[in-house]
Amino acid sequence: MQRVLLASKIHRATVTQADLHYVGSITIDAELMAAADIVEGEQVHVVDITSGARLVTYAITGTPGSGVIGINGAAAHLISPGNLVIIMSFVHLDEAERADHRANVVHVDADNHIVTIGSDPAQPVPGAADQLVGRV
């Protein structure tokens, strides 16, 4: 049996642009993609913390170091510049693979620059006063 587990998460990124007339997808700074181990064309889930919108799309590589998080195509109706989002990818693993699996969790600052890289998906962004630890 295979299970679908979190592979990576870019946590609390700020949307920098939205282009309704682009063909689709989400543009992500190449440095963030590398840190999260997300590759161009990979399916990603986007959760908008600000509006509650959720969608599935694919990743397009943005300029390294730019901090770009661009919502493209019809998704621009749901997610706006300035909104905070969580970008996640998932992996199918069998039981043997699951034992050693650790997600890549990338925390970013307000400019979408990397603050920390870890493996605990319940860990809040370090120093963020408005977040609760996901484990009790």
Swiss-Prot record:
<keyword id="KW-0704">Schiff base</keyword>
<dbReference type="GO" id="GO:0006523">
    <property type="term" value="P:alanine biosynthetic process"/>
</dbReference>
<keyword id="KW-0566">Pantothenate biosynthesis</keyword>
<keyword id="KW-0963">Cytoplasm</keyword>
<comment type="subunit">
    <text>Heterooctamer of four alpha and four beta subunits.</text>
</comment>
<keyword id="KW-0068">Autocatalytic cleavage</keyword>
<dbReference type="GO" id="GO:0015940">
    <property type="term" value="P:pantothenate biosynthetic process"/>
</dbReference>
<keyword id="KW-0865">Zymogen</keyword>
<dbReference type="GO" id="GO:0004068">
    <property type="term" value="F:aspartate 1-decarboxylase activity"/>
</dbReference>
<protein>
    <recommendedName>
        <fullName>Aspartate 1-decarboxylase</fullName>
        <ecNumber>4.1.1.11</ecNumber>
    </recommendedName>
</protein>
<feature type="active site" description="Schiff-base intermediate with substrate; via pyruvic acid">
    <location>
        <position position="25"/>
    </location>
</feature>
<dbReference type="InterPro" id="IPR003190">
    <property type="entry name" value="Asp_decarbox"/>
</dbReference>
<feature type="active site" description="Proton donor">
    <location>
        <position position="58"/>
    </location>
</feature>
<dbReference type="GO" id="GO:0005829">
    <property type="term" value="C:cytosol"/>
</dbReference>
<keyword id="KW-0670">Pyruvate</keyword>
<dbReference type="Pfam" id="PF02261">
    <property type="entry name" value="Asp_decarbox"/>
</dbReference>
<keyword id="KW-0210">Decarboxylase</keyword>
<comment type="function">
    <text>Catalyzes the pyruvoyl-dependent decarboxylation of aspartate to produce beta-alanine.</text>
</comment>
<feature type="binding site">
    <location>
        <begin position="73"/>
        <end position="75"/>
    </location>
    <ligand>
        <name>substrate</name>
    </ligand>
</feature>
<feature type="modified residue" description="Pyruvic acid (Ser)">
    <location>
        <position position="25"/>
    </location>
</feature>
<feature type="binding site">
    <location>
        <position position="57"/>
    </location>
    <ligand>
        <name>substrate</name>
    </ligand>
</feature>
<dbReference type="InterPro" id="IPR009010">
    <property type="entry name" value="Asp_de-COase-like_dom_sf"/>
</dbReference>
<keyword id="KW-0456">Lyase</keyword>
<comment type="pathway">
    <text>Cofactor biosynthesis; (R)-pantothenate biosynthesis; beta-alanine from L-aspartate: step 1/1.</text>
</comment>
<comment type="similarity">
    <text>Belongs to the PanD family.</text>
</comment>
